[in-house]
Amino acid sequence: KSCCPNTTGRNIYNTCRFAGGSRERCAKLSGCKIISASTCPSDYPK
């Protein structure tokens, strides 16, 4: 599961993934986190 700090980060992550980027690379690029839990932390709500 990916969690982003804001909508902009989420959009960057989604665009990166759509373009064929890996989850890790896209998370790093967009400032998002990849987590194993089912719910995102409050500081990464998107």
Swiss-Prot record:
Keywords associated with the record: Disulfide bond, Plant defense, Secreted, Toxin
Annotated Gene3D superfamilies: Thionin-like
GO biological process, one term: defense response
Disulfide linkage: 3-40, 4-32, 16-26
GO cellular component, one term: extracellular region
Pfam family, one: Thionin
Molecular functions per Gene Ontology: toxin activity
Highest taxon of the lineage: Eukaryota
InterPro entries: Thionin, Thionin-like_sf
Subcellular location: Secreted
Major site of localization recorded for this protein: secreted
SUPFAM superfamilies, A to Z: Crambin-like (SSF57429)
PROSITE patterns: THIONIN
Family (UniProt): Belongs to the plant thionin (TC 1.C.44) family.
Summary of subunit composition and partner proteins: Monomer.
PANTHER family (alphabetical): THIONIN-2.1-RELATED
Function: Thionins are small plant proteins which are toxic to animal cells. They seem to exert their toxic effect at the level of the cell membrane. Their precise function is not known.
Protein name: Viscotoxin-C1
Species for this entry: Viscum album
